[in-house]
């Protein structure tokens, strides 16, 4: 029970550390490109209350991917339209990647030099053990959530950041862009629902094979762990291996 509470608290903190800077980065990039909309509406801030979205928060907590309240942006205010659209779209995920890069070694340090080196002492002092676990779970969850949000948001489906990238790189008359703009949100909802159903079947019915039918979950976990996350843990594992 205590382990569950620790994990839950760590997850809540991790979600805030991932989603709030993500939205702030969008607002900051838009502001730097000439659009003051986010600043004038009070969204150029790290105050989590300003960015809170209940549905996105709950989805992130239960499925591992979600969103905060979208930052209001008016691309017509950008000094250079396509550049502004592109940099604003990718600002959030780049911020998440940087945060994940920073948090992974913090988690490693806590695990190796606090938990592993003092495991016998911690086992005799449960309160300190739970504290050490919490201090480890927080940066590790931030690392994992950050990569998940990175991969999830780069899906080229309206209204995700990936679709904004498509908008920045294609003509308004591009057929693929028009299709994604019109049906992207429906595809996204379908993927989320399908992923949730598969997760519930796997968890409560014990059907592990269903994970291979979880399209969104399989995509996010595979890309986040084996592609996007590989440079981070590969680099830091190499650095720590030198000592």
Language-model features and meaning:
Residues 1-243:
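Hydrophobic transmembrane alpha-helices and their immediate loop junctions
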């Amino acid at each position: 029970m205590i382990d569950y509470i620790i994990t839950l608290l760590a997850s809540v903190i991790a979600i805030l550390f991932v989603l709030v800077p993500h939205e702030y980065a969008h607002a900051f990039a838009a502001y730097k490109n000439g659009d003051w909309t986010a600043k004038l509406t009070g969204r150029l801030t790290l105050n989590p209350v300003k960015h809170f979205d209940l549905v996105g928060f709950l989805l992130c907590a239960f499925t591992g991917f979600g969103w905060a309240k979208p930052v209001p942006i008016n691309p017509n205010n950008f000094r250079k339209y396509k550049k502004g659209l592109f940099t604003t779209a990718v600002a959030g995920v780049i911020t998440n990647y940087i945060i994940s890069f920073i948090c992974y070694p913090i988690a490693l340090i806590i695990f190796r030099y606090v938990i592993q080196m003092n495991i016998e002492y911690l086992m005799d002092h449960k309160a300190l053990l739970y504290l050490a676990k919490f201090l480890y779970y927080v940066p590790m969850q931030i690392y994992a959530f950050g990569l998940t949000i990175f991969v999830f948001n780069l899906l080229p489906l309206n209204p995700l950041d990936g679709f904004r990238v498509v908008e920045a790189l294609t003509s308004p008359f591009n057929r693929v862009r028009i299709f994604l703009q019109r049906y992207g949100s429906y595809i996204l909802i379908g993927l989320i629902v399908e992923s949730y159903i598969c997760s519930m079947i796997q968890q409560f019915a014990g059907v592990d094979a269903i994970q291979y039918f979880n399209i969104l979950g399989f995509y996010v976990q595979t890309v986040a762990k084996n592609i996007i996350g590989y440079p981070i843990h590969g680099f830091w594992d190499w650095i720590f291996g030198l000592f």
